[in-house]
Regions:
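FAD-site-proximal beta/loop scaffold in flavoenzymes
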Residues: 150-178, 272-337, 348
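Glycine-rich dinucleotide-binding loop and its adjacent helix/turn
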Residues: 136-211
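Glycine-rich, N-terminal phosphate-binding loop of Rossmann-like dinucleotide-binding domains
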Residues: 16, 136-137, 186, 269, ...
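C-terminal, flexible cofactor-proximal segment of oxidoreductases
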Residues: 346-375
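N-terminal secretory signal peptides and thylakoid transit peptides that target proteins
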Residues: 1-20
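A Rossmann-like FAD-binding core segment of flavoenzymes
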Residues: 100-111, 127, 206-299, 354
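Beta1-alpha1 glycine-rich phosphate/pyrophosphate-binding loop at the start
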Residues: 32-103, 188-230
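Sec/Tat signal peptide C-region and signal peptidase I cleavage site
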Residues: 27-31
Length: 375
């Protein structure tokens, strides 16, 4: 089993002081054995949870399972697509988290046995746990969009998981002729970071305005309304007049199928052929949540809103984008807040204490143009 180290993001760091202050109130009276808490998923939520657990009780044995040795953050990745930022600025290793005494297993989890409380890793290693936290993020729900599968992402990138997909979409925009049509297909809710498609349209428009001003952007949307809509529309009319068109659900904007061979996108009322097709498909909880049995028929994970305990599995908690968390948006800041609250709930449960309803926040900060002119 390989071990790496981790560096966290800003949202996690901001919560450290609050976690430390809560530690004196939430320390468990441990029995003979040291409780083993395992977190699957090293994104914002999982990392925040693992770190908070150790800070709330340094005696806990905390393991973070994450197959990627480098974390590539989604926030600000739209700026990478628009050429305003480079991908390495989005990437972080796992050094600092493990320096806090957290074991980071650089393997994918392949199976969870809730009755035996064990996790099988891709290399055959089996880990035992007392409490398990699932923070698997999202996966694309390919079955929900005819014509779109893993292979299609190489022609029609979603770029909804930051990394190679981000760079593929950027390269396609750079290679597109002036006057080309960029189509962004937006799915119905729930989805990761609901305002992000419109930020993406804005920043792609910024790139095209400077480099390929004859080009257009068409947003095909499976929703009628979206977060911060008036602000985006105002920015589009002022900064990119005539460049961005949006077709909403009631106007026939829902994408019903795609053809990667021709870059054709089919909607309820028309077909469109794109020079660059950014297809963001419907989403669901990360695959391990389904394998474990924590996801329901919706593809997402029902939880107790106070403790984040799974409603389908004992001794399992679910946080972040994968969870059905009421009105909280699926965002990085919300995932980090849930991770810290979940850690407190676990520590209180081990101590036999009740958990108060957490006060959670979630924020999505969107950019419609760079603060200073780009070169």
């Amino acid at each position: 089993m390989a071990v790496t180290r981790h560096q966290t993001r800003r949202d996690v760091v901001r919560g450290a002081a609050a976690v430390a202050a809560a530690a004196a109130l939430a320390r468990p009276a441990l029995a003979q054995a040291v409780p083993r808490i395992t977190v699957i998923g090293g994104g914002f939520g999982g990392t925040a949870c693992a770190w908070a657990l150790r800070r709330l009780d340094a005696k806990l044995q905390v393991t973070l399972i994450e197959p990627n040795r480098t974390f590539t953050a989604c926030p600000f990745s739209n700026e990478v697509i628009a050429g305003l930022r480079e991908l390495p600025a989005q990437q972080f290793t796992y050094d600092r988290v493990a320096a806090d005494g957290i074991t980071v297993a650089a393997q994918a989890a392949s199976k969870v046995d809730a009755q035996a409380r064990t996790i099988a890793l891709a290399d055959g290693t089996v880990l035992s746990y007392d409490r398990l936290v699932l923070a698997p993020g999202i996966d694309m729900h390919f079955d929900a969009l005819p014509g779109y599968d893993e292979a299609a992402t190489e022609k029609m990138p979603h770029a909804w998981k930051a990394g190679e997909q981000t760079m593929l979409l950027r390269r396609q925009l750079e290679a597109m002729d002036d006057g080309g049509l960029v189509v962004i297909a937006v799915p119905a809710a729930p989805m990761r970071c609901p305002p992000a498609p419109y930020e993406r349209a804005s920043l792609i428009a910024h790139y095209l305005k400077a480099r390929k001003p004859k080009s257009k952007i068409l947003v095909l949307d499976a929703k009628d309304n979206y977060s911060q809509q008036k602000l985006f529309e105002k920015a589009w009319s002022e900064l990119y007049p005539g460049m961005i068109e949006r077709i909403a659900l009631s106007q026939g904007g829902r994408v019903t199928s795609v053809d990667p061979a021709t870059n054709e996108i089919v909607t309820d009322f028309g077909n469109y052929t794109a020079a660059v097709a950014n297809v963001i498909p419907p989403q669901r909880a990360g695959r391990i949540a389904e394998i474990a049995g924590a996801a329901d028929h919706t593809g997402w994970c029902p939880i107790d809103p106070v403790t984040f305990a799974s409603k389908l599995m004992p001794n399992v908690h679910v946080i972040g984008d994968a969870a059905i968390a009421g009105g909280i948006p699926k965002s990085a800041s919300a995932a980090a807040a849930q991770g810290r609250a979940c850690a407190a709930a676990i520590v209180n449960a081990l101590a036999g204490k009740a958990q108060d309803a957490p006060r959670l926040d979630g924020a999505c900060y969107n950019t419609v143009a760079p603060a200073t002119p780009s070169r």
